[in-house]
Amino acid sequence: MVALSNALSRVFGSVAGYKFPSFIQKSINALYVKIFKIDLSEFEPLENYKSLNALFMRSLKKERPFDKAPNICIAPCDALITECAFLDNDSALQIKGMPYKAHELVGEINPLSPSFFYVNFYLSPKDYHHYHAPCDLEILEARYFAGKLLPVNKPSLHKNKNLFVGNERVALVAKDIQGNKLYFVAVGALNVGKMRFNFDKNIQTNAKARFMQTYSYNPPIKVKKGDNLGNFEMGSTIVLFIQNTAFKDLKEKSVKFGESIGEFHAN
């Protein structure tokens, strides 16, 4: 099953990256936009995308405004927030009734502190697929975990235990503006094996590897809130683990990158 799902994702990636003649590609793009009800008002028109991949990875025409105050945490992506809560004895939920151990997801030996609040952001095929820094960050490590590429939609999350932990993923280990540890996890999915990171082009996902790879940064890579960290090639999931922050009521809310979702407590 693992080999099949990963192979399907590689094949899909090859087909989606193919550039058909312009009149054919425009029809393909139009069909995709219609099926998934994509709003292109913030993006280039569909005839400007030379492949499906180009459409999947579309960039915003204009920067979105967001609160620049350093104590405000913003949504890192366009997504539906499916779960959010404080960790309970190192347990987080991929969906209601389906817990997993947070330290396994991010690659730590010891359980994570209950001071961590986690937020699951589900990016559907219609969403803008880039992900951004939710606050000023210093990136210490990027950890790549080879794994399955199972779908991350709700039916699959209800069916497959430890789906996030078993799927291919990249966990960024960082420090936030207060010096607290923060984890930003990009989870792969069927047809979404490739995840790109702008700060390090050496991070290679869906590359037939079967082992964990760690990319360490000394000095740390500094990024500003709102900076474009990278993108999926289709929809998938971001899981954010953050401390010392008060969040709004987020569960089952659709958010846009740049929206204020929380506020850091004063030290």
From Swiss-Prot:
It is a peripheral membrane protein. Is synthesized initially as an inactive proenzyme. Formation of the active enzyme involves a self-maturation process in which the active site pyruvoyl group is generated from an internal serine residue via an autocatalytic post-translational modification. Two non-identical subunits are generated from the proenzyme in this reaction, and the pyruvate is formed at the N-terminus of the alpha chain, which is derived from the carboxyl end of the proenzyme. It is found in: Cell membrane. Its EC number is 4.1.1.65. It catalyses: a 1,2-diacyl-sn-glycero-3-phospho-L-serine + H(+) = a 1,2-diacyl-sn-glycero-3-phosphoethanolamine + CO2. Heterodimer of a large membrane-associated beta subunit and a small pyruvoyl-containing alpha subunit. PANTHER family: PHOSPHATIDYLSERINE DECARBOXYLASE, PHOSPHATIDYLSERINE DECARBOXYLASE PROENZYME, MITOCHONDRIAL. Belongs to the phosphatidylserine decarboxylase family. PSD-B subfamily. Prokaryotic type I sub-subfamily. This is Phosphatidylserine decarboxylase proenzyme. The lineage of its organism: Bacteria, Pseudomonadati, Campylobacterota, Epsilonproteobacteria, Campylobacterales.
